[in-house]
A protein has these predicted regions:
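Substrate-binding/catalytic cleft of secreted carbohydrate-active enzymes
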Residues: 99-102, 109-295
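Secreted/periplasmic carbohydrate-active enzymes, especially glycoside hydrolases
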Residues: 1-124, 128-132, 160, 166, ...
Length: 295
């Protein structure tokens, strides 16, 4: 029991030991519940339930990603938060339907591109056995559009990182934090922005690795930017922007034996269902079209 005087603020650490916990993994999504009750003398005034799970994770140079000591190949997608015709308002049943469809063709991981996910997605990922790359920003101080997050970056980036990490850190499905996607600052490692943001994340969670999605990963690898994160996120590494041979050379370069990396975005396509009418009048649904950057 922790006693706090009225109108006071206190920070306390309580340690509990769980004997032989049932581990969380993709097949056995064992979850526990921490119940925090607030009393005013003997009157119950508030209850806060915190679901969580026990599991270990590690990214390795030679064996990739390890979940509870076992190698798991990440078969992921970058999924934006909108729900098609339903729009961006969250509908938990629709998210569950999305995850079921993704799992039906072998997906076991989701990158929340390119902003913080809805809490409902993480709740379902915990229960349904999906790994989450939790992404906080699409841009930093250097914006991509006239009225994007860069307008608010200076005032809000610390608060937003704290809010995201503190909100999501008890979800066993979350395996990595992503600082951003294809940010302009990746070309300027001397400014130290990546390391600066990484250290903010570590203030609130030091148990998970930090990454970001590099849009020109061969450049950010050469210039040292990717050495400022724990795991290298490589957008479209195969065939473009450096090619697969570059990454094998980079990850195995003397002194880089500790590094690990993953494809944070790849296999981009513009073929889909139906027939569309762009400037060329038609594009088929037979997977005949793809953008130049796609793997």
């Amino acid at each position: 029991n922790i006693k706090i005087a009225a109108n006071a603020i206190d920070s306390s650490l309580v340690s509990l030991k769980v004997e032989k916990p049932q581990l969380w993994d993709l097949e056995n999504t064992n979850l526990y519940l921490a119940k925090v009750s607030v009393y005013d003398r003997k009157t119950l005034t508030d209850v806060y339930d915190v679901p969580f799970g026990f599991r270990t994770l590690k990214f390795t140079h030679n064996n990739g990603f390890l979940l509870n000591g076992k190698r798991v190949q990440l078969k992921g997608v970058c999924m934006h938060h909108d729900l098609g015709a339903l729009g961006t308002a969250i509908n938990k049943s629709a998210i569950e339907r999305q995850i079921n469809i993704l799992k039906s063709f072998g997906t076991n991981a989701i990158r929340t591109s390119h902003n913080p996910p809805a809490p409902e997605l993480l709740e379902l990922a915990d229960k349904m056995g999906i790994l989450i790359l939790d992404e906080v920003f699409d841009c930093w101080a250097s914006g991509k559009n006239e009225n994007d997050y860069a307008v608010h970056y200076s005032e809000w980036h610390k608060k937003d990182i704290e809010a995201l990490v503190c909100r999501d850190r008890n979800h066993p499905s979350v395996i990595m934090w992503s600082l951003g996607n294809e940010v302009e600052e990746q070309y300027h490692p001397e400014k130290g922005v990546v390391a600066y943001l990484r250290d903010i994340v570590r203030l609130y969670d030091s148990t998970r690795p930090v990454t970001f999605g590099a849009s020109y990963p061969s450049k950010s690898a050469i210039n040292g930017t990717e050495l400022q994160v724990d795991v290298h996120g490589m957008n479209y590494p195969s065939g473009v922007y450096g090619g697969p041979d570059f990454y094998e050379t980079f990850l195995n370069y003397p002194g880089h034996e500790h590094l690990s990396g993953f494809a944070s975005e790849s296999s981009s396509t513009i073929s889909s269902r139906g027939v569309y009418f762009p400037k060329g009048y038609q594009i088929t649904s037979y997977d005949l079209k793809a953008p130049s950057w796609a793997s």
